[in-house]
Each structure stands twice: as C-alpha cells, then as structure tokens.
Regions:
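C-terminal segment of N-terminal export signals and the immediately downstream linker at the start
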Residues: 24-52
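Surface-exposed, polar helix/loop patches in the mature regions of secreted/periplasmic/lumenal proteins
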Residues: 94-133
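A compositional/biophysical signature of low hydrophobicity enriched in polar/charged and small residues
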Residues: 16-19, 25-27
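Short, glycine- and small/hydrophobic-rich beta-strand elements in well-ordered beta-sheets
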Residues: 25-30, 62-88, 120, 127-132
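Residues at or immediately preceding the N-termini of alpha-helices
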Residues: 7, 48-51, 99
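Short amphipathic alpha-helical segments
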Residues: 48-75, 109-119
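Short, well-ordered beta-strand segments in beta-rich or mixed alpha/beta enzyme
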Residues: 35-44, 81-106
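N-terminal secretory signal peptides and thylakoid transit peptides that target proteins
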Residues: 1-18
C-alpha cells in the first residue's frame, strides 16, 4: 500500500467517524431538549386559613393545554426529621412534555390570571424545575 492510498483510507475513515460522532451528539442533544419537565412549586401562606382558597386557585391550572399532570398537596404528617421542610403551606407539582410546554404554561392566560388573583395569599413562593433523565 502506498502513501497516497493510506492517506485516502485515513481521510475516509476520519470522515466516517466524524459524521458518526456528530450524528450521535445531535441525537443526545435533541433527547435532552425533549425530556419531560417537572415544575415543583411551594407556597408559604400569609394566612393559614386561606389554604383552601389557594388550592382552588391552583386547581384552575389543570385547564392549561400543556399541563400533562397536576398534583396539589399540603404538608404531610410524616415523622419530623431535620431534613424535612414543613414550613410551606401548599405544594404544586406539574408535568410537561418538554421545555417548550413549560414555557407556554408561563405565558398562558390561565396562569397569568392565577398569579394576578391569588398572589396576595402567599408571602413566599419557591419553584424547582427538573428535567427528567
């Protein structure tokens, strides 16, 4: 095998490997962008007596088209442990098909109305967004 032939073989192998790794990287990138999203919200109430009113408001969010699942909760009566935060009043867990679905939720009129009509009930809100892996 001469140098010219070896060089051609090397170049064609390099091209094939590069194309393969690029395709694999694109596939992984696309997979990451399309993973389901969990949107976890914790509300600290100004007045504990307003808990049911906030729960009613939170439940209006299930009408948003991009919401796939909704779970509303209150502090569980589980064993008290140092690592468990029981200072919040109402929790909300929403699932979306992807980041675009969660972004659409943020600007949906139902969500905007919820914030406008119920934000006076809480003095603190903390949100955790997680991408499913």
């Amino acid at each position: 095998m001469n140098n010219k032939s070896s060089r051609r073989k090397f170049i064609s192998t390099a091209v094939i490997l590069t194309a393969g790794s690029t395709t694999m990287a694109e596939t992984l990138s696309m997979k990451t962008k399309n993973n389901k999203i969990a949107h976890q919200v914790y509300f600290w109430l100004k007045n504990p007596e307003d808990r049911q009113k906030l729960i009613e408001g939170v439940n209006t969010l299930k009408k948003i088209k991009t919401v796939r699942q909704i779970h509303v909760g209150i502090v569980a009566g589980t064993e008290k442990r140092e690592v468990i935060d029981t200072s919040w009043g109402v929790s909300l867990l929403l699932f979306f098909d992807d980041i675009a679905g969660e972004a659409s939720y943020q600007t949906d009129p139902i969500h905007l109305d919820f914030v406008k009509n119920y934000s006076n009930l809480w003095n603190k809100v903390v949100i955790y967004d997680a991408e499913m892996v």
